Amino acid sequence: MYKRQIFSYDYELFFGIMSGTVQKTLIEPTNLLLDCMESVSARGNFFIDYLMFECLEKLSDERAKSDLKLMKEQVKDMVRRGHRIELHLHPHWIDAKYNGDGTWDYTDYTHYSLYSLDEDVRSRMFRDGTIYLTKLAREVDPDYTICAFRAGGWTIQPFCILKDCFKENGIVIDSSVMHGICQDNKYSKFDFRYAPNKEIYRFLDDVCVEDENGEFVEVPITVYNRNILKKTIEKVIRTFSIKKKCIADGTHQRLDLPIEPRRKKWLKSMPTAFSMSSRNPFIAALAFRASNKSLITIIDHPKDFTENALSIIKLYMKKADSITYHDIKQKL
């Protein structure tokens, strides 16, 4: 089967007890990814966490100014190298506090989800984010337009409250859904268990309900079933191979959410997103080969970068061509 793939990355800091710094969490790992993709003619799609830029724009601190400049130049470099930048929103930035040393305090997650915001606040975020990223991209490509969105924390539901935000800003593609996955905690919830198990589909008012005449398109993150056998193989491989360490200086760890017992998590067979940094290349290759999808949409984060990501990019590019969300939009 002829396959294509989408390399998608959420460009953001950590949202745990240590946010990490811009240099170690974004700039350095992203540059490694960009160089690797260029070496194999791969094209990436970077979902840019706009509110991070907005918060830095408000600070007069020299470190913050320097970090902002680095990020803006890197985003323009993405476009210059032929990659795409698209809109990503993590609304809990409105409650974040700057620590003065390049890191952030996220102890308040009240507004973690888009549905926690008033309508006018959501509309403003979409509008300002689209304008900001478009302006950055057009310093490189005068005709650039944003066409896709990914919700922070995948909280794209209920879509009916976001529909006008999409329409008003020319966004036609969403890529937040992961078939079979759900979450419900005090800050966020989503339920994709009954979403169409398809590579791409149209929808209108609900991202989990296909509508052939819908004006929006869902490009779901591809998942595969990660059972106890695959987990065991991964563990054995990790035991006898050089450990691939994350180079970033932040952490996902949070103290405000319960941690699922390790044994229960280990025994559970679960749908798992196609990713790269946290996967072993051997397991990634098996999952890619076993997938019955002709389009594989991969999600990763520069902040999670390990050398595994570089190996898997090179491996996957031997098996399939890479495309962008804009390529999909042009064929609608």
Describe the residue ranges of each PLM region.
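Generic structural signal for well-ordered alpha-helices
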Residues: 30-34, 71-75, 126-134, 163, ...
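Metal-dependent polysaccharide deacetylase catalytic core of the NodB/CE4 family, i.e.
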Residues: 50-155, 177, 214-218, 223-228, ...
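Active-site-adjacent pocket scaffolds in enzyme catalytic domains
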Residues: 148-289
